[in-house]
Amino acid sequence: MAKITSLIGSGIVAATNQVGPHVKHIPAVGNLQKQIVSDQIQVRWSSTETSLKNDISATDVRGYKGHDMLAPFTAGWHSTDLEPLVIQKSEGSYVYDVNGKKYLDALAGLWCTSLGGNEPRLVAAATKQLNELAFYHSFWNRSTKPSLDLAKELLDLFTANKMAKAFFTNSGSEANDTQVKLVWYYNNALGRPDKKKFIARTKSYHGSTLISASLSGLPALHQQFDLPAPFVLHTDCPHFWRFHQPGETEEEFSTRLANNLENLILKEGPETIAAFIAEPVMGAGGVIPPPATYFEKVQAILKKYDILFIADEVICGFGRLGTMFGCEKYNIKPDLVSVAKALSSGYMPIGAVLVSPEVSDVIYSQSNKLGTFSHGFTYSGHPVSCAVALETLKIYKERNIIEQVNRISPKFQEGLKAFSDSPIIGEIRGTGLLHGTEFTDNKSPNDPFPPEWGIGAYFGARCEKHGVLVRVAGDNIMMSPPYILSLEEIDELIIKYGKALKDTENRVEELKSQKKIKSS
């Protein structure tokens, strides 16, 4: 994912090997960096659209290279050597940069603008709430009507398992951070002070705060941050194509991973393991759907040892997979749930934690004993964010967004999977409106391209050149387009993906020829 290795066009590429993902980060040097810079100039400043040019200020003309922002998940040389892609306007499934160049936003921002970029009802909901009550908090039994209404709506909407309470955050990272505090609070209340460890999975992404980055199973989030925290353990990534043994079926693979999970629990001591956290489909780690019977077997083990299940629905929630939540698709019955992103279609920062009755009853009793539940944020349940989220959920229902996703997703998935025979593609995978492409040589998970070639970064830059924005993580490409994508826009996406793929195939041939000449 771009968060873990590089933004599109970056010269930082990640190696993927048989042992684990994204373990090596190599700065672009020499011809690769020159190629990337050249591509960026060509992409960013060769606009074919003129709709915004009259609005460009002197600052825009001068450009933003060397800007003042410490940019998230961005290498320092990007800011000094490259012009950033500065987005100024959005219309439906498209965004426009400051020069008026138009891009199909195949990532929906960061997996979040499910209703596209300019849904007037969401703008109106925000404006109405700003005019009525721009802010009030939710501390000390004070609250606002939008936050109370949204809590009820979320509890009614989540049907995979009964939930009793909703706690509001500003992001998915904060939601997963909160989960750890809730679980510790819960076990302390039950007189289990040693039951504090968390198990997450290699290649998972759960956020970038101190705790949520620790939960994440991506080394780039840990390097030089003194992470992960010692109470976090990581078990196998359930990526069948990459990690299955010869002759092993998906069910057998799931059984092996479940056994490994149980062995880890027994090694650490079941009395020390508090919770297991998982995304229904792993998102930023490469779009990895679970193998057959995986969650069934994992849940049986968690129940056996009285370990809570936290479902991270930050990416999968609110229709992305063709069900309202990923838990419904994979028959997951969690004790706690994290949501964000499509909760407001990305229009306002908001996340939430859903808490089962079994956990919330204990928290209720403990807070009475202590005199308060001492956790919260200034903007927990922000009335404007909640008003926008309420309108978002209303639109999902009125427009039957689940039916819409299921109507367009087959064409989206099948159209992209038609490129599976490409000699540089190892695997194309996905479900609903989530897609992942992994580049490898010889179509094998054991034959990655040399990381210094930057194949994923090159493909991302060519997509950008052709007018599509995707996410790059090493040699993995990810897409999660808006739910409002039309069938014609899917055709456009597939055509431009194919053009970028052909460019990248040619680039690989060129690099292989250069390598052959050097070695001869």
From Swiss-Prot:
Give the signal sequence positions: none
List its EC numbers.
2.6.1.96
Q: Which UniProt keywords apply?
A: Aminotransferase, Chloroplast, Plastid, Pyridoxal phosphate, Transferase, Transit peptide
Question: Transit peptide span?
Answer: 1-44
Listed binding positions for substrate are: 205, 341
Principal localisation? plastid
Q: GO cellular component annotations, sorted alphabetically?
A: chloroplast
**One Pfam family cited in the UniProt record for this chain:** Aminotran_3
Residues annotated as binding pyridoxal 5'-phosphate are: 172-173, 312
| Residues with the N6-(pyridoxal phosphate)lysine modification | 341
User: Enzyme class, one word?
Assistant: transferase
Q: What superkingdom does the record give?
A: Eukaryota
Q: Which Gene3D superfamilies has this protein been placed in?
A: Aspartate Aminotransferase, domain 1, Type I PLP-dependent aspartate aminotransferase-like (Major domain)
**So what does this thing catalyse?**
4-aminobutanoate + pyruvate = succinate semialdehyde + L-alanine; 4-aminobutanoate + glyoxylate = succinate semialdehyde + glycine
Q: Does the keyword Chloroplast apply?
A: yes
Q: What PANTHER family does the database record attribute to this sequence?
A: ADENOSYLMETHIONINE-8-AMINO-7-OXONONANOATE AMINOTRANSFERASE (PTHR42684), GAMMA AMINOBUTYRATE TRANSAMINASE 3, CHLOROPLASTIC (PTHR42684:SF19)
Report the function annotation for this chain: Transaminase that degrades gamma-amino butyric acid (GABA) and uses pyruvate or glyoxylate as amino-group acceptor. Cannot use beta-alanine, ornithine, acetylornithine, serine, glycine, asparagine, glutamine, glutamate, valine, leucine, isoleucine, methionine, phenylalanine, histidine, lysine, arginine, aspartate, threonine, tyrosine, tryptophan, proline, or cysteine as amino donors.
Can you tell me which family this protein belongs to?
Belongs to the class-III pyridoxal-phosphate-dependent aminotransferase family.
User: NCBIfam families given for it?
Assistant: PRK06105.1
Protein's name according to its UniProt entry: Gamma aminobutyrate transaminase 3, chloroplastic
Q: What is the lineage of its organism?
A: Eukaryota, Viridiplantae, Streptophyta, Embryophyta, Tracheophyta
